[in-house]
Amino acid sequence: MRKKQTLILALLTVFTSLCHAQTTRFAMTLSTDLGLAGKNYKIVTPNVSATYDLTPKLSVGARVEDAITLAKIQGVKTYDYLATLGGQVSYDAFRILTMINVQPRLIVGHTIGGGHDRGYMYCQGGIYLKADRKNGVMSEIGFGIRHNNYRGDLYKDKTSFFVSYGFVLR
């Protein structure tokens, strides 16, 4: 499983780097999301995404994340470490102070491997704020809601609020 994660990350990095030499319509984002759903469930998802601007405001992309889940089930503390692969759509809705883009974003993904009981599909929607620049490194922050729909009976489906911080390389 670790080789699969490394391979996907390497392919996304190479793909984004090669395309960056041709145009700035491609971007790569490195970020971490922290999901909070009460004291018995937390999820941390370091992730990387490669996006392509279809129009000046609309972009689509692929996303890979390492989902680290910390849970307390019937008094027993457990953790899970799974990789997910998904896609995202975002739209630059408007600007604040002519230098900050407000961007609603929808992300959908599924776990890679991990067995039947541990796997899940997730849907995440949020509002992200980032600098309105065409090139260089920009920081972004975001917040929203994430829902994990587990396939097995090991975990119950969870909805959590999340905050995100990352860097956009364009």
Label every model-predicted segment:
Residues 1-25, 170:
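Cleavable N-terminal export/targeting peptides
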Residues 20-68, 164-170:
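Short glycine/proline- and aromatic-enriched beta-strand/turn motifs that initiate or cap beta-hairpins
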Residues 113-170:
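Gram-negative outer-membrane beta-barrel domains
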Residues 49-137:
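Gram-negative (and chloroplast) outer-membrane scaffold detector with strong preference
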Residues 31-37, 65-69, 105-113, 142-148, ...:
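Outer-membrane beta-barrel pore domains and translocons
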Residues 6-9, 57, 162:
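Small-residue packing motifs within transmembrane alpha-helices
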Residues 33-45, 73-79, 110-121, 150-158:
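Solvent-exposed loop/turn segments connecting transmembrane beta-strands
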